Amino acid sequence: ITLVCGCMFSGKTTELLRSAERLPAARVQAFKPAIDTRYALDAVVSHAGRAFPATVVDSAAAIPPRIRTSVSLAAIDEGHFFGVELVEVVQGLARCGIDVVVAALDRDSWGREFPAMRRWVDVADTVTGLSAVCARCGREATRTQRLTPILDRSMVGGPESYEPRCEGCWKAPPEAPP
């Protein structure tokens, strides 16, 4: 089990795709949450445009029944949208001999750790923490700045809605939802 985490625009999906592209396509199955409709409905796509065909699922529980028998690597993008339930699903896949790579944000726009992060650190064999370049000053960025009005803790968006920021340039949004 490998977890790739960090702020937005840190290269999480690019790293996930790199892992997926190392094996023959028939041995890899990518998954993405149905809520993520940004670039393509049926593919995991990086901000730079790299893509890999994906199975779209509504919940973590929908992943195991959709795994093809030839699969030796499950690549799961936007893992933070699946919540803590994904941890148990991934552990089950690993027990069945399937390697798993999960790409996920580590914190929300308020700088709060997503609930599953502590569990991931406990169960992952490898945790790769990535950073980006601050959109304001060019220093190392570990935070995600929301640029548009916030309606919920988890909101899908790209460069029109978010940008990476360093600790000094990041400002928490006015009010955090529960």
Description of each model-found segment:
Residues 1-66, 108-119, 132, 156-177:
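Conserved P-loop
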Residues 19, 88-96, 116-123:
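Catalytic-core regions built around general acid/base machinery
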Residues 69-73, 79:
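Short acidic/histidine-rich motifs immediately flanking catalytic phosphotransfer sites
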Residues 75, 99-106:
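Structural recognition of the conserved hydrophobic beta-strand(s) that form the central parallel beta-sheet
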Residues 78-93, 108-114:
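Conserved ATPase-coupling elements of RecA-like P-loop NTPase cores
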Residues 130-155:
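Short recognition patches in nucleic-acid-associated and regulatory proteins
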